[in-house]
Structure formats: structure tokens, C-alpha cells
């Protein structure tokens, strides 16, 4: 989400996505863009180990509210776009979000409920996040991109809720609570 935001405030990864979209648009190849917000599954990829070992996860997100989206909803929309024969998705950019905008603190509460154990969200400074990622061996450009993305979130750019999932699939977006229950084994 944000690929069409103002160039001066848009994080590098999103700007690069938009550049790729422009190339596709100019090619005149039929397209449908799926502009998905922050994936719920990022919690599994980036936080499950620390939740298992420390009962906490560490993110430089402050109190930013984010409409996290489950990748299963993105996949369902992709199926509709790819199998539609009426052309209603052609040339469109679908903004895909979850059905609720949550802070990481609220996400920790939901994880706690679903896992049956206390999970804490620790808001870390950008500097501490950079150090932690560097210590993990991450490349500098990835570190910078992640910090930029969370700055974008803290500025309120990922809190909007889009009706696209329900409009296209006929189903409400998967809730964070359902995600946490479905993926509980990854955090235990």
C-alpha cells in the first residue's frame, strides 16, 4: 500500500514497486496490481522465534495502527483477478488491507489470547532496530528499507481499511485473531 503516495515520503521499497508498475503500464500488457498492506505472516517470519524464546517481539513501530492483511486474502483476490473473464480487474490497482487497524501492542494482546501465554510488544528505537538487524547479518539496504517502512507506518499511512477483499471475494478479511489461532504452532 502506498505505491501511489507522494514521492518525498514514500519508502524505498514502495517507490521501487511503483517504478515496476509504471514499466508494466507503459508496456500495454494487461495487468492487475495487488497493493497489499503489511502481511500478518511477517509476524511468523520476523517475530515467532523471539515470541517462543522470550515471550516478546521487538519492532520499531511505536503505536502505529496498521491494517495487517493475511496473505490468504491476497491469494484469494489474485485467484479472482486471474480467473475473471469479464475484464473487471484489468488495469486496476487493488489496495488490499485487513478489516481492522491494530497497533503492535494490540496484536500482542491477541497473540497472548490465542497462544494462552503472555506475549509482549517491545517498541524499540530505530537505532536499536538497526543494530539488531545488523547483528543478524542483514544487508544495509534491507535495514534502511525496514526502518523507512515503519516510519511510514508511524506517520499513519498503513491504517486505512479497504473494502476490496469483501467486494471481490464476498468474504470478510481474515482477522488478526483468526491468523493468530491458525498460526499458533509457529509461536509455541
Segments (PLM) and residue ranges:
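Oxidoreductase cofactor-interface core, primarily capturing Rossmann-like NAD(P)-dependent enzymes
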Residues: 3-120, 124-127, 131-136, 141-142, ...
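A hydrophobic C-terminal alpha-helical subdomain
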Residues: 127-188
Amino acid at each position: 500500500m502506498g505505491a501511489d503516495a507522494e514521492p518525498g515520503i514514500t519508502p524505498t521499497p514502495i517507490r521501487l514497486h511503483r517504478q515496476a508498475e509504471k514499466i508494466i503500464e507503459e508496456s500495454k500488457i494487461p495487468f492487475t496490481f495487488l497493493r497489499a498492506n503489511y502481511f500478518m505472516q511477517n509476524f511468523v517470519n520476523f517475530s515467532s522465534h523471539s515470541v517462543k524464546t522470550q515471550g516478546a517481539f521487538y519492532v520499531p513501530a511505536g503505536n502505529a495502527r496498521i491494517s495487517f492483511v493475511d496473505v490468504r486474502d491476497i491469494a484469494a483476490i489474485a485467484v479472482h483477478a486471474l480467473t475473471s473473464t469479464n475484464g473487471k480487474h484489468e488495469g486496476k490497482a487493488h489496495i488490499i488491507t485487513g478489516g481492522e487497524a491494530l497497533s503492535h501492542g494490540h496484536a500482542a494482546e491477541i497473540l497472548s489470547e490465542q497462544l494462552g501465554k503472555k506475549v509482549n510488544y517491545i517498541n524499540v528505537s530505530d537505532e536499536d532496530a538497526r543494530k539488531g538487524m545488523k547483528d543478524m547479518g542483514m544487508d544495509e539496504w534491507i535495514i534502511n528499507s525496514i526502518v523507512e517502512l515503519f516510519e511510514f507506518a508511524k506517520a499513519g499511512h498503513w491504517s486505512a481499511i479497504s473494502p476490496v477483499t469483501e467486494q471481490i471475494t464476498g468474504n470478510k478479511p481474515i482477522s488478526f485473531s483468526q491468523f493468530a489461532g491458525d498460526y499458533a504452532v509457529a509461536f509455541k
